[in-house]
A protein has these predicted regions:
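N-terminal export signals
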Residues: 2-21
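Extended, low-polarity segments enriched in aliphatic/aromatic residues
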Residues: 23-307
Length: 307
């Protein structure tokens, strides 16, 4: 059973449950702010960057931008861009099976800059058509995945910032999807989607595998922040779901970041998430959490620190 370790300052409600503080050395740290604004967004980034203890170097800092979701909480993303020296918004091309529009670098640039993003502050990581096949330790469906070499070589840090979206092809779109698909190359995305682009358990396996491979290849240079706002979900038997603007969560642990975001909505234990039917777990995205845990891509146990 998962326990959430809390600071003495707060013991927040997570769904319909309150989790008591219990000693657990294996827990990952998750920072939480109930109020969704630029100040707290930046504060969580600063804490994560400090905790990551990344060396100062001349490489770029990236901020993951979702090219189809530029306007949601846009002011927060722009504030972070202005806050981080030598930073750019980063995005990758669509899957190679969709070569038009955002499926090629120039089309991607046109689509994003048409939404008002400064071309000089945007880096499409596929720009050089140079890719690295990164290995996936413990992958169940994939043993490697293609990622842009520019990401791996030119960036000292990337903040994987996501509007935690429901619904999504993956049930929800958070840290896992924004790494395993979002930071994969066009070919890498096609590897993850597979033949026929079917939303089935094997897709979730490949998504978890790719997330772990790219995360490991970046050697802990990824920071994860989920903005859980404007949430609308259908009722779920066994819990009282929460909707609306629920807060911001951030972690150096990919799985913990998504687990904490899901917990704000559903408030379940890992065993309770896992007990739902396969179809429910596919529809809700719970399989992301289960499969990431199985391949040791992160921790479902976390210490929640309220800022």
């Amino acid at each position: 059973r998962r326990t959430i370790l809390l600071t003495a300052a707060a013991m927040p409600m997570i769904g319909s449950k309150v989790f008591a503080a219990t000693p657990n050395q294996g827990a990952s740290t998750v920072y939480f702010s109930k109020d969704i604004n630029a100040e707290n967004f930046l504060a969580i980034y600063d804490r994560l960057r400090k905790d990551a203890n990344l060396p100062e170097d001349r490489r770029l800092s990236g901020i993951k931008l979702h090219g189809d979701d530029v306007d949601t909480n846009r002011g927060m993303w722009e504030a972070l861009l202005n806050h981080i020296p030598n930073s750019k918004f980063v995005e990758c091309n669509y899957a190679s099976i969709y070569p038009a529009g955002r499926g090629n670098t120039q089309g991607n640039i046109r689509a994003i800059t048409a939404q008002g993003v400064d071309k000089n502050r945007l880096d499409i990581l596929d720009r050089n058509n140079e890719y690295t096949e990164v290995p996936i330790k413990g992958g169940k469906e994939l043993k490697s995945v293609s990622a842009p070499t520019a990401l791996l070589k030119e960036y000292g840090c990337v903040a994987v910032t996501a509007n935690f979206r429901i619904p999504s092809f993956a049930g929800f779109s958070g840290a896992c999807k924004n790494v395993g698909i979002g930071l994969a190359s066009g070919e890498g995305k096609t590897q993850v989607h597979g033949l026929g682009v079917r939303k089935d358990a094997r897709f979730f396996r490949r998504l978890a595998d790719a997330s772990k491979g790219i995360h490991d290849a970046m050697d802990n240079r990824l920071l994860f922040i989920n903005v859980v706002s404007n949430i609308h979900v259908d009722p779920l038997k066994g819990t009282k779901v929460r909707t609306g603007n629920l807060g911001i969560v951030g972690s150096l642990d990919l799985l913990a970041a998504d687990q904490a975001a899901a917990d704000l909505i559903y408030g379940l234990t890992p065993a309770e998430y896992n007990a739902y039917s396969l179809q429910e777990k596919i529809d809700r995205g719970f399989l992301q959490l289960e499969y990431l845990d199985e391949i040791k891509a992160g921790n479902r146990t976390y210490k929640l620190i309220t800022l």
